[in-house]
Amino acid sequence: MRIDLNSNTSGGIHDVQNRQTGALRQTLGPAFGFRRMRKAELATACVLAASLASGEALAQASNTPTQKSGAASEITKRKAKRTKTQSDREINQDRAMRVGARPAPVAPQIDQFAKLDTLRIKGLEVNLPGPADTLIQDKGGIRSALAEIGIGFIAWTQNTYVNNLLPNAAKSTIANQQYSGQNPTFYTLNYMMVTYDLSRYGIPDGQIIVGAEQQSWTWQPGGPDRLGIDTIAYYQTFLDRRLELKVGYLMNSYELAGTVVGGNPGANVFGPSSNVLYQGGMNFAPAPTPTLNVTYHFDDRLYNKLSVQRSTSPDGVFAHISANPTGLDWSTANAGLLLLDESGYRNSAAPGLLDTWLRAGVGFNNSHYVRLANPTQPRTGDNSLYYVAADRQFWQSNVHDAASRGIYGGFSVMGAPPDLNKVSQYYEVRLYAKGLFDSRPSDQISLVATDTVWSDLAVDAAAAKGNLVHRDAKAISGTYTAHLGPGIYASLGLTYIDHPTSITYTPQIGHALNFSASTSIFF
């Protein structure tokens, strides 16, 4: 509320006070004359002393009209001084603006989500949205109340529809469907993850993570349906955060390789993922396994990450989930250990510093795999894999306010022995943009081209049986992901696939143009 000392109301109050004072003076008259004189003399002395102490005050006093009382004179001088100070400040600001100087910095406000951000899941290579970018944020104070006792959480649901738009596409019964989109395909993936802060007990960055995942598919080979855990983990750091340790039931697809385009799972439900990593035994959300991950940071950018995990089933993802839908079993049939090692260089975008992530990894698996050239012979346990990937920001569209916005490019190369793996090579080139338009600063656009190369041994074996075969499957996809509001993403994608089936095909299913629509909502 602003109070105007020169308002009519204030003037009325002073009039009443003056009338009351005048009546009192008429009654008491000369009795108080001596006091009035002494009071006026005292006020005059104060004014002279102040004038001598300050040349500026003297000049101001010399320009101020004489008042009837000492108190009124002091009030007038204070108001005049404030007015001059304010005028000087405005003049200085105006001069600064004319020469292009920036205004004085404003003290930053306390971010209400800063404390909540400390409870986000640690040790991941992908960027799950923070509490501020969720649908419920901190409504009702529920997140803040849980944070007081060290608990954080995130939940999300991804719902996707895929359908081949080509007019001559060969449809089939659901039971005989051979690829996602051959018939209209729908699937839903739902997650709930809770963290507990152990740093309150003196454990550096200590955290316990517990998560569950539920999925349903109209095309079961894409899944299958399941309800179970996706994470039960313990995390902490050592040596002033130079060393990270994470152990438990993990999903390494979020911790190694960086297969999600742009690093945001909410924006990448269509991003092509190679089977090389999964057929090599890497665990992921629907198929977590016991894992120990140790990361050493040589400096702020260079790192090495070592992972020892129980391999998923060597017979494939479908076989693993069918045998262990809850994810709690220690192992599945014929599964052994998978050793992964990744070295990388990574720096995040900053004003004038472009985002860069280079990584390369190798894996060795002693699970018992079927020999593709001789399936009837005893299984062997000498499988391996490798990958090399890079992502680089080419241009920053908003350097100072949001350095991560701009245009990016990247590539991935992966491989595995053709005698034990149906996919022996995988190549990917990607171009994507974050916040390309000022009116849509959180949207993402991606264009991705891939080539999946099948094992020569597997292709030759299928051709020997009289099947039509293809030695690779090429695809190109474009996706636009709109950030519609806190925690709400919607994606539209179009993917052309040359030979969408695995190795064998018929002339009617040699090509596909899959339309995809998806929503991702984070809570």
What are the language-model segments listed below?
Residues R2-L5, D15-V16, F34, C46, ...:
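N-terminal periplasmic/intermembrane-space "pro-region" immediately following the signal or transit peptide
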Residues G130, I136-F153, L165-L166, T195-Q207, ...:
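Short loop/turn motifs that connect adjacent beta-strands in outer-membrane beta-barrel proteins
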Residues I151-T157, G206-V210, L243-V247, D300, ...:
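Transmembrane beta-strands of outer-membrane beta-barrel proteins
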Residues A155, Y191-Y196, I232-Q236, L292-Y296, ...:
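Residues on the lipid-exposed face of transmembrane beta-strands in outer-membrane beta-barrel proteins
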Residues N159-N163, A212-S216, Y249-S253, V308-T312, ...:
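Transmembrane beta-strands of outer-membrane beta-barrel pores
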Residues N183-P314, N421-A461:
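Outer membrane beta-barrel
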Residues S348-S439:
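Long, well-ordered mid-to-C-terminal structural blocks that present hydrophobic/aromatic surfaces
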Residues I509-F523:
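Outer-membrane beta-barrel "beta-signal"
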